[in-house]
Amino acid sequence: MEPIDDRIMVTGGAGYIGSHTVIELIEAGYTPVIVDNLSNSSLEAIKRVESITGKEIEFHHVDIMNEKALDEIFETGNIRSVIHFAGLKAVGESNKLPLKYYNNNIAGTLTLLNLMDKHRVKKLVFSSSATVYGDPHTVPITEDFPLSATNPYGRTKLYVEGILQDLCASDPEWNCIMLRYFNPVGAHPSGLIGEDPKDIPNNLMPYVTQTAIGKRPILSIFGNDYNTPDGTGVRDFIHVVDLAKGHISALSSLHSKKQGCVAYNLGTGRGYSVLEMVGALKQASHKEIPYQIVSRRKGDVASSFADPSKALKELGWKATHNQDDMCRDAWKWQSLNPNGYSDS
């Protein structure tokens, strides 16, 4: 492949989705520049990405709220565009600590946007979320659904989307793509990188795999009285490698044509219940996964899955990994790294 020689800043590039996206960037010929404060990620992830790709990666241990340090990276970096992952993402914690979430996710993004504007780097791929749809009345969800978050985390994504729309409306040089993720699962097929929450996991799959491997005595399932086929919540689980590739498709689109500000769903278009995912992981791991039903979690919705047809039509992207792939790769990562990156 001919080198593209584009330097792409990746905020939060040491995190779960960020690290997988960095691999795809390198494979597509881009040069990633990672900016991460390592608050919920690990330097080991970057080392392993270097091992997978055979490339040395530029890394800056910088918080996006540190305006001076971030400014210096833009000054010297010759950055063409930015993929913005950095942010806090625990729904439950956001209900308890809303100011922390508004400060980090909104004020931090404003710091980044001001510097991008200053340095005339006006192309952004933003890591949004399906939480901006709140509790949808019908599924599948299209991008023109009404937006209303049910928790502070979702509201931070919603507010940033509004800021980006205002920015693009005020200045035609700005181009932003907002990727509304559904539920990322799985890991790189090498088993070298995957989801390694430093504290309490925010996503279902680490709970399931940690229970299967014996790190947790029992899996708690939040509610079995939803209006779904088996009573447990239904979600659009998407393989993290598919999600990462979606960012490359978005970046390619940003670089090739005038966008304005556009939102895309990144999902499979298929919902699986929590119990279905537990069953699939049980098959992949050949392990028993004891579970208990506990009360619903505040802010959780019954069913959420995407209509991803707009991303296929306009970005040429679609998810290719199925449920078995997701569970196989999640289990490979967990079984090879029982304690995550701290095993290294």
Swiss-Prot record:
The active site is at Y153. Gene3D superfamilies: NAD(P)-binding Rossmann-like Domain (3.40.50.720), UDP-galactose 4-epimerase, domain 1 (3.90.25.10). Keywords: Carbohydrate metabolism, Galactose metabolism, Isomerase, NAD. One of its GO terms (cellular component) is cytosol. Pathway: Carbohydrate metabolism; galactose metabolism. NAD(+) binds at G15, Y16, I17, D36, N37, L38, S39, N40, D63, I64, F85, K89, K157, Y181. GO terms for molecular function: UDP-glucose 4-epimerase activity; UDP-N-acetylglucosamine 4-epimerase activity. Its EC number is 5.1.3.2, 5.1.3.7. Substrate binds at residues 129-131, 181-183, 202-204, 220-222, 235, 297-300. Pfam families: GDP_Man_Dehyd (PF16363). SUPFAM superfamilies: NAD(P)-binding Rossmann-fold domains (SSF51735). GO terms for biological process: galactose metabolic process; monosaccharide metabolic process. Disulfide bonds: none annotated. Optimum pH is 7.9. It catalyses: UDP-alpha-D-glucose = UDP-alpha-D-galactose; UDP-N-acetyl-alpha-D-glucosamine = UDP-N-acetyl-alpha-D-galactosamine. Its cofactor is NAD(+). The keyword Isomerase applies. After the expression has peaked the enzyme is released to the surrounding media. Catalyzes two distinct but analogous reactions: the reversible epimerization of UDP-glucose to UDP-galactose and the reversible epimerization of UDP-N-acetylglucosamine to UDP-N-acetylgalactosamine. The reaction with UDP-Gal plays a critical role in the Leloir pathway of galactose catabolism in which galactose is converted to the glycolytic intermediate glucose 6-phosphate. It contributes to the catabolism of dietary galactose and enables the endogenous biosynthesis of both UDP-Gal and UDP-GalNAc when exogenous sources are limited. Homodimer. Belongs to the NAD(P)-dependent epimerase/dehydratase family. This is UDP-glucose 4-epimerase.
